[in-house]
């Protein structure tokens, strides 16, 4: 039953983001650590975006580089929401690798497109072979 619930969850997530995924502009972000991959899709009108950050292996560095998101409208404001995550504690206790998770992971945050492109999102240290899915909605 747990497996079926997982399929239902991801089918609903795909339906919610289908237009962006199939009609948006794809972006790949350069990450300084080769063990981390980041890519996303931004809607043609730049109103929505979805980004995936994948941790392939143990990171080479103790601190993760910020995720600077591409393709957004600099003057717009976006609500950043964590759509999916591995089994890490989303309670303010950072699990076994961190004492505290970035604030946007526990509470949706609203920030400018320029800030997301220049400063970026602080990333958690993820376990190897895991990923997080991030949604953005212009407000």
Regions found by a protein language model. Give the residues of each.
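Carbohydrate-binding surface patches
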Residues: 31-74
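Short coil/turn segments at secondary-structure boundaries
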Residues: 21-31
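A broad, low-specificity signal for short, low-complexity segments enriched in glycine/proline
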Residues: 9-16, 40-42, 95-98
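Aromatic/acidic polysaccharide-binding cleft in carbohydrate-active enzymes
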Residues: 1-14, 26
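C-terminal beta-sandwich/jelly-roll accessory domains of carbohydrate-active enzymes
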Residues: 57-139
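Alpha-helix capping/termination and helix-coil
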Residues: 11-22, 76
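Feature captures the RNA virus RNA-dependent RNA polymerase
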Residues: 10, 29-30, 39, 112
